[in-house]
A protein has these predicted regions:
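Hydrophobic alpha-helical segments within soluble ligand-binding/sensing domains
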Residues: 109, 169-197, 243-244, 293-297, ...
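Flexible loop/hinge segments that line or gate small-molecule binding clefts
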Residues: 138-177, 294-297
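Periplasmic-binding protein-like
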Residues: 69, 121-128, 147-152, 201, ...
Length: 446
């Protein structure tokens, strides 16, 4: 049953004494009555509407709002690219943003979260290195009514539903099929040139949920190529330096390798450096794949050294999570199926590289996205995710990882899948997806 708004919920702001009383209690010295009335009226309507629908009370941000981006580490080009997207989206939406480097340290990020709350952040975008602090950060976010979304590193089987309403979204690219696709490209190249052969893997951080799902996608692809053998793997810890050392070790153990499956583009860069130093010719006598679609990854494909990468586009991650924070700060609320989301990566090779370079690398001052169009607050009728965005299947995301003792599927998640909400969300987002992820920038003139 739809509940009606009760006029008694609204202060009598037509009476000057009521306005003055509210302003005095809020210590709003220097704020005009007109500005106070504009903000108070919107806040009252939003809060009353939320109450009538059974939602928690709504706190509207004044204009853009203030957010923080807790980055995993600036040692990775991916993170720098993602921060570019976050800052561009925040600027377009009028938000104040502060970006801080977590240096691959979950405890440091927890401290940074507390510091940003103390500094007045209303929302935090988290790019965690793992699941070490996510539960505590989510708990603090709910206690202090600070909006939170997270990407990549997390605690498998810990969902926003268990954390509370203020953990608004966990979102990552769908990595199983993405990493499967780039592995297929390497296997096909090895088969076409050598008729088969040995390959190795250089992974990310051991135990990281993204690292695990990428390895599962890789291993699934290898089932279709029995002549291609994975003979060894070592962790590259997501960065160039550690990956170069890992690749050097693998070369000493397996000198006859024909392919390398690198767990991201920074890892691939380190592998290429090690291979070249050892006398190999990447792209000719050994084929390498990466992941993420960083600027460096695209340029490496252009040079012929990297065969393929799964382009999830780090700028998109930054823009997507920033836009979500903006929307919830301004009164929009997600359905259950919108709180855990995937977006579709595109396998990038020389065949489709030019479109990527034009939009994301050689774009000059032209932004790759219409950031305001991503917002359901700014564009309630014609919003566009600008990528294939869809509800997450947590069994695909975390399959093969043991569930904690006593864990059960969150009620909100199972109900959304059972009652058709998840499928309806998938269809709705597909219908709104108009601006092609790999097409020209919507901001390009002419």
């Amino acid at each position: 049953m739809v509940k009606k708004l009760d006029p008694r919920w609204f202060p009598e702001f037509e009476q000057r004494r009521v306005v003055d009383g509210h302003m005095e209690r809020l210590d709003l010295h220097g704020v005009s009555r007109r500005d106070f009335m504009a903000f108070a009226s919107a806040s009252a309507i939003a809060s009353a509407t939320a109450l009538s629908l059974g939602y928690p009370s709504v706190a509207l941000a004044d204009k853009g709002g203030k957010m923080a981006h807790l980055m995993m580490t600036l040692r990775l080009e991916y993170v720098a690219n993602a921060d570019t997207g976050a800052n561009a989206a925040a600027k377009a939406l009028g938000m104040e943003i502060t970006s801080v480097d977590g240096q691959l340290d979950s405890e440091r990020q927890l401290n940074q979260f507390e510091q940003q709350m103390a500094a007045g952040a209303q929302a935090v975008m988290l790019h965690a290195p793992g699941g070490g602090s996510i539960r505590r950060i989510a708990e603090l976010a709910n206690q202090n009514k600070v909006w939170l979304d997270n990407t990549w590193g997390t605690l498998p089987w810990f969902t926003p539903f268990e954390a509370g309403d203020y953990y608004t979204m966990y979102a990552v690219p769908e990595e199983f099929s993405a990493h499967r696709a780039v592995t297929v490209e390497v296997c096909k190249a090895v088969m076409n040139k050598f008729g088969g052969g040995d390959i190795v893997g250089v992974t990310g951080v051991e135990g990281n949920s993204t690292d695990l799902i990428r390895s599962r996608g890789r291993n699934d692809a290898l089932k279709d190529f029995p002549e291609v053998k994975l003979v060894g793997e070592l962790p590259g810890k997501w960065n160039r330096e550690d990956s170069q050392k890992a690749m050097e070790d693998l070369i000493s153990r397996h000198p006859d390798i024909r392919g390398v499956i690198a767990q991201n583009d920074d890892v691939a860069d380190g592998c290429i450096a090690a291979l070249r130093a050892a006398g190999y010719r990447p792209g000719d006598d050994v084929f390498i794949s990466g992941a993420d679609g960083t600027t460096g990854g695209a340029e490496s494909i252009e040079r012929g050294q990297l065969l393929a990468t799964s382009a999830n586009v780090p700028q998109y991650m930054g823009a997507l999570l920033t836009t979500r924070l903006y929307d919830v700060l301004h009164g929009w609320r997600p359905r259950a199926a919108e709180r855990m989301m995937n977006w579709r990566s595109i396998a990038m090779t020389k065949d489709n590289l030019d479109a990527y370079l034009e939009r994301y690398v050689n774009n000059g001052d032209t932004e790759p996205y219409d950031y305001r169009r991503m917002s359901k607050v700014e564009h309630p009728d014609d919003w566009d995710p600008q990528a294939e965005l869809f509800p997450m299947d947590i069994d695909l995301e975390w399959g093969g990882i043991a569930k904690p003792d006593g864990w059960s599927y969150p009620k909100e998640y199972t109900e959304a899948r059972a009652n058709g909400e998840a499928e309806a969300v998938r269809e709705e987002y597909a219908a709104h997806y108009k601006i092609d992820f790999f097409g020209p920038s919507p901001m390009k003139q002419g």
